[in-house]
């Protein structure tokens, strides 16, 4: 009788630990995906800014400023 109670308690502990581990890794993967997506977005915006600086037109300075503001808002 005691062995059944101990076995069921151990099983519940293992299941609880497994669920906690699974949710931790799920949150970690989501966080890494989010950071990686923001990193790729920043690289694309940096390429666009360099392209617009090469063109050297006064209108594109406003576009660069707006892109910088959008980037700052996404990082916050």
Curated annotation (Swiss-Prot):
Keywords: Cell membrane, Membrane, Plasmid, Transmembrane, Transmembrane helix. The chain crosses the membrane at residues 1-21, 35-55, 56-76. It is found in: Cell membrane. GO terms for cellular component: plasma membrane. It is a multi-pass membrane protein. This is Uncharacterized protein BBD24. It comes from Borreliella burgdorferi (strain ATCC 35210 / DSM 4680 / CIP 102532 / B31).
